[in-house]
Amino acid sequence: MMKRFFTWALLVLSVGTAVAQNAVPDTPVVRFLRENPRRAAFNTHSYEFLPIQDTPAPKGYKPFYISHYGRHGSRSDWGGPQYRLVRDLLAKASEQHLLTPAGDSLMHEAAVIYELHNGMDGRLTPRGVREHAQLAERMYHRFPEVFRKGCKHIRAVSSTTPRCIVSMNGFTGRLMSLQPDLDFDLDTGEKYYAYIARGENSTISARTGQALAAYRKTIQWDTETVYRTLFTDPAEARKLIPDAVAFQNAIYDCARVSDPFDIPDNMYRYLPFGNVVKFHELNFLSAYLNQCDSKLNGELRLPRAQELIDTLISQADAVISGKVRKAADLCFGHDWPYLGLVCYLGLEGVSERYTLEEAADNWLPSWYCPFAANLQMIFYRSKKSDEVLVKFLMNEREAKLPALEAVQGPYYRWNDVKAWCENRIPRTQIVAHRGYWDGNAENSIASLRKAQEFGCWGSEFDIHLTADGVPVIHHDRHIGELDIQTSAFEDVRANRLANGEPVPTLAEYMGQVARNRECMAVLELKPQSTAEREDELVEKCLQALQPAPARNVPPEFAAFARRQEPAKVVFISFSHHICQELSRRAPGYMVQYLEGDIAPAQLHAEGINGIDYHYSVFYKHPEWVQEAHDLGMTVNAWTVDDRKDIEAMRDLGVDQITTNNPVLVREILWER
């Protein structure tokens, strides 16, 4: 979230035709930039403080609590080499007396940018501190009832990155100066970072990269105007700077950090407006496709905001119920989690579902996600009603939630908002049966990789134990005439899957699992000929999940080195004995019984924490789904491929659906 998704040097190698300046279409985004060209910075655009306007609350309702998520304030970027490139190339041109007055001016401005950057990437600038101080002051005077008449306690947590911590200090410091009797609880740490600033998703990034790579090829750049603007002899300048697009991109990078460094000049004036539009477009489309509810990735992106949403809801409910007394919960993080949050809520404008091309024309990036972007949820109550209302402010502007009916203006029933959030994304998850093997071999490394790339919650695969004790991945016990369980690994390994892969081992499979921590490995342990063989299979599987020992670690750090994240796995089996043994030996893992002949209550009493039954079982015993959930157990239905059955299992509320058709299941689960 801190660095841009794409290296611009690679971008310019893959762009389309270089031509003279083209006409710029009249779109909402273009009009937005013409109104204020500095907005072309997108997520490095400094905050615009606009006049505050409030719609009156329903009669008798007063604010009593604020839930807030704020992006850090203006910071330096990661463009040091770009700033130096512009400065040094123009300095060489100056030595050859090639600069126009505009070129000379740009040379000096780029030098200032480079000096202010000072090799410090991602550092909060003084402007960033001022932004949060001003936001705090505006919040304080806008909702005085929350701070002056209510509880004096404020809880604030921050991402672990310094620019967020300093932003938090700037915000809370101003509140303290305005009202010294406020009581602050400030904190930061990895457990907060996990939901404040959840990491990127490699599957989403790869899909976005492919879409943008194709889009770049359609772009036509003006490569002539910049030479006429900056140089007295364009032909000589071309010898010095042969790649006009890369050079202009470096100028664009200088321009987009002028606001954070309080440079008043509009540095975009050195570039053709059409090129500014395209640089801006490529910059924000990456964020939109990766972080918002786009038609390309929305179904993958929104679930990643759920933990943050759930945290904010639980904090608010604790205050509403009286269990906790607080005036406000303040959270300081980053742009990408912020975008995921406001899109999950479905706030008007920012959460529109667009294709790449539609977003390029219509999505207003710096309006939604400048530096210090913020969401404020203002809670209201009345002495005459138990109904709590909430108003959403996005960058201090009242925001509507089109999916819900408002009580009045931008005021919504909190219970309606919670219900909307509860149903915003499907609670039923997709498990690819034997991997996503359409076009691949079942139970192959390729099918696992495809399930990961598709964004499946989990990928199921089958494990047999060879005669010499090696766990291998294959559905049937036999490969032709070869019985896996009575054959040596060497003989099993000699066989090839339909796609040419050798029969994989569990260790090889888990190696691919480790490359994508988002997708659960659903390990089906096949029944063996004896209980002793089943115990051996359990032992070998648990061994495969142990992290590799750290090497060359000083003794005093040995305990820390062993604290590695456990593998994200689910165990399933038709063998009741295997499930019992797994539950006994690995109580921290999810274990699901497959046979379908035992009621949830009995399994729960044995310590087995899940059921994974054929969907036909749930037609006979639909009550088992709720029974399992009441006991805190998970419920999976297998193997569900037809629309009617998928809809039925979804409506029953199963937690996972195992399927050979992940595309159809996703389509049905996300029907909007």
Stretches with model-predicted labels:
Residues V15-G16, R84, G346, I445, ...:
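Hydrophobic alpha-helical membrane context
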Residues T7, R75, P337, Y436, ...:
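Intrinsic structural disorder/low-complexity segments
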